[in-house]
Amino acid sequence: MRTAIPEKLLKIVEEIHERGNVNLTKLTVLKKWFEHPGRLSAFAIWVARRAVARKGKTSGAAAELFREARTLLTGADEVHPEIDRQAAEVLHDRLRDFQNEYREDRWGRIRIVHHWNLVLVEYGLAICLWHSDSPTRGYKLAADYCQNYDPRYGNGLNGPSQTKIGEIVRFMFTLEALEDTGNEQRTSQQGRFQAHKICI
């Protein structure tokens, strides 16, 4: 089902181009899109796959975690991703424990992260496993995926964020088109079933 949300994201890209930086909260427009059944899980797995593809140079335990994530996520359907739940839970816990170091700050506890892409995989798996009905978590995952630190602005949507938002827009267009195709096929099958019943 086609929506206007992707166009709203493209306007954010234009705004970044014009102003240099916009607030991460602009991505809250995604919450409405995530309310549609199945979209949030599909998005979470898509982000996890993108994160695995962007792993960069890694070695040791981090490289092993990336390999396990790639194996788990390979072949999952774009619209209705079904992954091995038990393996996903084990991997999620290993990812969480791998970067489980915190420091105290005046704003509270801050997690120390050395491999951001592994955190994105962890968050994506958590949504797919336990929070597929939480559009707020979907928005936060999108913000974590798109955010960029620039010393002029701090953390926000700037520079490379434009490319990542564009990737999300392409994902949304693809998923909406696949949803439409699936609905058409189901409608066609139902029509054939009804016709068969009438003939009987």
Give short role names for the model-derived ranges.
Residues 2-200:
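Structured binding/interaction patches within domain cores
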